């Protein structure tokens, strides 16, 4: 009941979403990239987002020998927030207090999620970490599933994730605790992110949120940042992680959340453990077993089965003076 109430409180209704989308159509003249992101199949967007996020994560793992994981995550958030604000025109104008609170909650949640995720994958495999972290999105999907078909699809995804994740994390209790915290924060990321996505700011809400998150989590990431500031190579690589994982990955999420309900979004996130396993195999030589492949297949079946509903777009109605 608590989860459902939280989701309903912070998730825009279908009518509100449609109204916001209509307002966005009226105010904005999107470029070709925005038009493509607004019309491409959500499954394709998720794969693209996942590839970007886990290329960044694989690069981050390689940096952990030289920089503390929480510091890499902090620079990731900082770099992405800075880039997104630079490319967002007029991001500082016309924010309401309610919108700013929502953006701040989203940004702080995202920053903490990144930090705990990196602390976890410093201790456990990338693919298994993402799979266990998927518990959060599964809870969101379960709380928002209303049809039998979607329930069956969710069941396939859950079983696939359990199979893919396995039952062991190399007896690393700290890694398990960190990834479970990241999982809870991922659930909040979906709920708060859906709210921010429907604010008429392109990716400015994401950028501003990440800057706020950077400031809020400075006590966690900044104390170990000395080696990064004095090494242009390390600084550039840390910021590159942010561009791949947050600016590109989360930016695509914002476009997707404007188009589909969070129930479908949460289940489509099952593609991320699959992609993480493949990226871990290619980039980090973390090879999936036969059982892992079975888990991947079950996830893909669940994703294919679910209803492909989208948030209805409303055409702008212009009322003329009869006189």
Predicted regions and their residues:
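Hydrophobic core positions of alpha-helical segments in small-molecule transporters
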Residues: 48, 75, 106, 132, ...
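Hydrophobic/aromatic residues within transmembrane alpha-helices
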Residues: 63, 72, 76, 120, ...
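Hydrophobic alpha-helical transmembrane segments of multi-pass integral membrane proteins
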Residues: 41-45, 71-86, 150-156, 174-181, ...
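Glycine-/small-residue-enriched transmembrane alpha-helix faces in small-molecule transporters
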Residues: 3-74, 105-108, 112-116, 159-162, ...
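Hydrophobic transmembrane alpha-helices of multi-pass small-molecule transport proteins
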Residues: 84, 135, 149-168, 211, ...
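Alpha-helical transmembrane segments of compact multi-pass small-molecule transporters, enriched
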Residues: 78-83, 132-143, 212-216, 264, ...
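C-terminal-most transmembrane helix of multi-pass membrane proteins
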Residues: 21, 25-32, 77, 270-323
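Hydrophobic alpha-helical transmembrane segments of multi-pass membrane transport proteins
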Residues: 48-55, 59, 87, 104-119, ...
């Amino acid at each position: 009941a608590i989860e459902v109430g939280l989701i309903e409180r912070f998730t825009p209704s279908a009518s509100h979403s449609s109204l916001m989308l209509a307002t966005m159509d009226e105010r904005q003249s999107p470029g070709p990239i925005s038009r493509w992101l607004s019309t491409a199949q959500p499954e394709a967007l998720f794969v693209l987002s996942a590839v970007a996020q886990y290329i960044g994560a694989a690069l981050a793992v390689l940096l952990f020998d030289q920089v503390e994981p929480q510091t890499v995550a902090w620079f990731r958030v900082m770099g992405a927030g800075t880039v997104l604000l630079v490319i967002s025109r007029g991001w500082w104008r016309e924010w309401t207090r309610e919108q700013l609170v929502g953006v701040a909650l989203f940004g702080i949640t995202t920053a903490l999620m990144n930090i705990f995720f990196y602390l976890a994958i410093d201790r456990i495999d990338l693919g298994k970490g993402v799979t266990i972290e998927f518990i959060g999105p599964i809870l969101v999907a379960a709380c928002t599933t209303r049809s039998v078909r979607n329930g069956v699809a969710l069941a396939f995804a859950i079983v696939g994730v359990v199979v893919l994740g396995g039952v062991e994390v190399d007896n690393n209790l700290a890694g398990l605790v960190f990834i479970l915290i990241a999982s809870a924060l991922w659930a909040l990321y979906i709920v708060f992110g859906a709210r921010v996505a429907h604010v008429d700011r392109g990716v400015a809400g994401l950028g501003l949120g990440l800057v706020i998150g950077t400031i809020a989590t400075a006590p966690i990431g900044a104390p170990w940042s000395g080696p990064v500031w004095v090494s242009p190579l390390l600084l550039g690589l840390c910021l590159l992680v942010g561009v791949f994982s947050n600016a590109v990955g989360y930016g695509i999420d914002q476009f997707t959340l404007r188009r589909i309900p969070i129930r479908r979004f949460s289940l489509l996130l099952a593609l991320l453990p699959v992609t993480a396993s493949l990226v871990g195999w290619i980039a980090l030589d973390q090879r999936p077993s036969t059982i892992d492949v079975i888990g991947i297949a079950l996830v893909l079946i669940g994703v294919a089965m679910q209803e492909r509903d989208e948030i209805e777009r409303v055409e702008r109605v212009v009322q003329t003076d009869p006189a």
